[in-house]
Amino acid sequence: MAETTALIDYGAGNLHSVENALRTVGASVTVTADPDTVRTADRIVLPGVGSFRACAEGLRAIPGLIEAMEERVEVGGAPFLGVCVGMQLLADRGLEHGATPGLGWIAGEVRAIEQTDPAIKVPHMGWNDVALTAHAGPVLEEGEAYFLHSFHFAAENPADIAAMTDHGGGLVAAVARDNVLGVQFHPEKSQAYGLGLLERFLQWRP
């Protein structure tokens, strides 16, 4: 029986493009907000576009969804991928439109990108290098990916930082711990690089 990948639908956009990219690399995708479906999924992908607060509130508005994700990922060990704001939601809190609690799976907070140089544009938009750290793991590879964000994940523990990018200074491009991976960039917009990442995610056995 094919493994199932639950793509969490909580009103946070970009579902269709992420779903298409996952199907392109052979995933059996279930788009869902149903806690029982999440509990039985082999893999979980949490997308997200827009503000941290709106995404966090969208998740919390669905009864039992966060608890099901925690049960399947944090307790059950299912491989998890967070994309863009879905990655940021792994943090303890986000500071966009005031402090908002995140999932708290990876210590840190999501802060605005500081524009210290007028030549460096915010939002950080377009293709940029993904430079791996010693904690990258098997899913990530060096390359160029497509970014679109005005806030960044400030991780407390350097061991949780899997990749960096440079935009007027270092920004976290990916975080990882055990079976949890989050990427700030958009794999579904990153052409061959992004499809390769999704394919390796489907093969990942943390």
Report each predicted region and the residues it spans.
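Extreme N-terminal starter segment of soluble prokaryotic enzymes
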Residues: 2-6
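Structural signature of beta-strand start/N-cap positions in the alpha/beta core
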Residues: 28, 43, 79-81, 144
